[in-house]
Design a protein with these regions (language model features):
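Non-catalytic alpha-helical scaffolds and adjoining flexible linkers that form interface surfaces
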Residues: 1-19, 24-176
């Protein structure tokens, strides 16, 4: 049995009382797993899209055993736009990421986004950082150098990999 920590990106019904879930972990990438009894009426399921859990699964038959649930979010406090943001982030992760990447910061950026949502802080910058990490982990290297950005936004010169200028512009909500 393999143990990993992952993000649930998709939940679908499978046969009678079972669920098929897609998870993304840094160690094993995207996995589709079957959870027997996941829709049972006797036992409440903790398989919620967007939750980060510890999973235990077999590589032979992709049967999952949920070993520890860490609900690090307060869904009932979110408005519909914040819920849509979580759903969109999980959809992008599910569609774009499929291989393992130990250097990926997607899970960390997602946790930062959820923490900002929970603490009622400004979450748009963490969402943009999450999107950039998803693009980077999927193989696209967004070119955010000064020569490209200066054609779009009237900004002062900055180091090519230092994106704090861009995030400060977003933070100040300047419109151009």
């Amino acid at each position: 049995m393999i143990k990993t920590r992952g993000l649930i990106t998709k939940v679908q019904p499978y046969k009678d009382n079972h669920l098929m879930i897609n998870i993304y972990s840094q160690d094993y990438g995207k996995k589709s797993l079957i959870v027997f009894g996941g829709k049972s009426k006797k036992k409440r399921s903790s398989m919620i899209v967007g939750s980060i859990n510890n999973f235990e699964f077999s590589t032979k038959d992709n049967v999952c055993k949920l070993s520890e649930v860490q609900l690090s979010h307060n869904w009932f406090l979110y408005n519909k736009h914040q819920l849509k943001l979580i759903d969109y982030a999980c959809y992008m992760i599910d569609r774009l990421l499929f291989i393992e990447d130990n250097n990926s910061l997607v899970i960390d950026a997602y946790e930062e986004l959820v923490n900002n949502l929970n603490d009622k802080k400004d979450y748009m910058i963490s969402f943009f950082i999450l999107e950039l990490n998803i693009l980077k982990s999927s193989g696209y290297e967004p070119n955010l150098s000064y020569s490209i950005i200066s054609k779009i936004l009237p900004i002062e010169k900055y180091k090519d990999q230092d994106l704090t200028v861009l995030f400060n512009l977003l933070d100040q909500n300047k419109e151009f």
